Amino acid sequence: MRIAVDGMGGDHSPSAVVEGCVQALEEFKDIEIYITGPEDLLKEAFSKFKYDKERVIFIDAKEVISTNEHPAMAVKKKKDSSLVKALRLVKDNQCEAVISAGSTGAFLTGCTLIVGRIKGVERPALAPVMPGKNGPFMIIDAGANVDSKPSYLVQFAKMGEVYFKSVMDVNNPKVGLVNIGEEEEKGNDLTKATYKLLKEEKDINFIGNVEPREVSTGDVDVLVCDGFVGNTVLKMYEGVASTILSMIKSEVKSSFLAKLGVPFLAPALMNLKKKMDYKEYGGAPFLGVKGICVKAHGSSDAKAFKNAIRQARKFHENDLIGKLSEEITKKSFDNQKKF
């Protein structure tokens, strides 16, 4: 499998990106890395490690898109940027996947404009998978579409369902709609209209509205919402997780008795920390585009980046894009038959 990597994306690039690539090359013998960025800088970063040089291809790119630039303008103007060149590799079928920890806006815009949407997809969506009490769950959309239509959300539900079936091996994923109450009539015009449409979808296992307090504790696989709500929920969830872990650490240090109990609690606490660590999940797939596009966290370290590569590899193994294309095409055909 050939994976394009934006070597200059993220807060700790290129060092963390390069180290993550080296770790992935060591663990996965069937991948090749096409890394974009200033070639001399990248080669210098790689020189600090031992790696299979035959499986790393350097693509020279002189420009970098920063997080404070206008996404669409930057993608269109900076043709020689590390991000655009990485996306072009997927567009031109030189790579099967692309990963970046850079500007989220530029990445999502570039994926849509350069890689292109799957035929029939109204709007691609960012779909991070998060740790929950009863197992991982997906938030879709988590920020790509701040303003959405009911038909978009129905398609998000379908894409999330396909993901859980093909990647997570869940036969009948439960789909919920994020709302301020469980009752059907609760919410705004968007959620009310979406609820009615989802209820009519016989091939989606729609369980109804899910309140924010049940996001991590409820028995649901796919949480559907517009990008504004999804991004808010995602960042709140990350913040709460970080705060809880910090509070536990402070309490343990606060008394002698608490410190005595650490050896007994350490395994459980370490397991909890691992479950709530975004680094374990690597990145969020951008579903609805023609290639495997994974957005890594901006503050990704080497471990997070390696896991983002692991994710991309798993998506490829499970033919996620092919299954999404098949399902969306089938759905579009079924809708045409109604008229």
From Swiss-Prot:
E.C. code: 2.3.1.274
Principal cellular location given in the protein's record: cytoplasm
GO BP field: fatty acid biosynthetic process; phospholipid biosynthetic process
GO CC entries: cytoplasm
Reaction catalysis annotation: a fatty acyl-[ACP] + phosphate = an acyl phosphate + holo-[ACP]
GO molecular function: phosphate:acyl-[acyl carrier protein] acyltransferase activity
Transmembrane intervals: none
Listed pathway(s): Lipid metabolism; phospholipid metabolism
Organism domain of life: Bacteria
Pfam families from the UniProt entry: FA_synthesis (PF02504)
Keyword terms: Cytoplasm, Lipid biosynthesis, Lipid metabolism, Phospholipid biosynthesis, Phospholipid metabolism, Transferase
Cellular compartment(s): Cytoplasm
Complexes and interactors: Homodimer. Probably interacts with PlsY.
Biological role: Catalyzes the reversible formation of acyl-phosphate (acyl-PO(4)) from acyl-[acyl-carrier-protein] (acyl-ACP). This enzyme utilizes acyl-ACP as fatty acyl donor, but not acyl-CoA.
Similarity annotation: Belongs to the PlsX family.
Protein name in UniProt: Phosphate acyltransferase
Organism of provenance: Clostridium perfringens (strain SM101 / Type A)
